[in-house]
Amino acid sequence: MFYQVLHSILSLTAVLLNAFTMYLAITKSPKIMRPCSAIITIKTATDILTSIMSFFVMQRIITDGSTILVIPTGPCINFGKTACYVGHMLMLCFLEYNLIWMISSYIFRYYILYVRQPSIKKLVFVAFCLSIPSIIHMVVWFSIYDPNEASTYLPLFGSCDMVLSGKIVYWSAITLITQLFITAFLVIVAYIWIKETLCSYATKMGAIKKDVKNFNKRLVKVINFQVFLPSFIFLGVITFASMFTGKIGYEYAQYAISVIFMFSPIISPFSYILFVPHYKNVITGKVKNPKSKPTKCNPPISTTRSTGAPFVYNI
């Protein structure tokens, strides 16, 4: 019972935080920041879907290396094993897509710095294209899943009717968890690359570009904060691997994996709320005076763009 309550609180918190961040991105972003707001909106939408699926399943994962048991305890149990399996797979899929979108957002930032701002239509198109492999992957697993497949397991793990097991559950879980680990590692690689790019860009700007350099520093703070998000994926995967290899017992580890994964969508919104000035001002109640003199935090908005200088609002 405590696990369900904790899971519900974490899921609800993640949904509310990401919904609020999405609201800020859609309604409080200036026109010049629209592409950036689209990137944030897509990421928060993915986090919301992850949280909803996590609440829907409320899964415990148990493994001894030879078998993997997924024990759902959420609302999905009212709809049967297939619904629980779909929710289990979608939650892992959304977690992976979230990491993929983080990598894409780093590439977009590079594109904004050195080329030009992508249109919102292009961003949505890219987001859709990135989702196609995951959709195909999920459809394949769903089509071959057999809820009636028999498997041996210890009765104390849970009710016979609400334990997902068998070869399909085993290999689909192994595949997605491995993909999560690889994708999280690629996020770290992309982070190192984009941070070096931003630092190099700031050096090249020179003293006359202090406003741009100031916002560039804010951008570095955003990605420095976001680099902690894959650490929750790493920790969850390591917990699973330790239980898989028998290094730790299942008594507590079965609850830890899903709970650890949930901290990623909970923490993610703060990278924007804390470091994007327009969103932070909404929280603190600051009202920007349009007649105030330009400062480092309020550079004048120009309709023209000098060569090599990005729009400073793209965080």
Swiss-Prot record:
InterPro entries: 7TM_GPCR_serpentine_rcpt_Srd, Nematode_rcpt-like_delta. It is found in: Membrane. GO terms for cellular component: membrane. It is a multi-pass membrane protein. The chain crosses the membrane at residues 6-26, 38-58, 83-103, 124-144, 174-194, 225-245, 256-276. Keywords: Membrane, Transmembrane, Transmembrane helix. Belongs to the nematode receptor-like protein srd family. This is Serpentine receptor class delta-31.
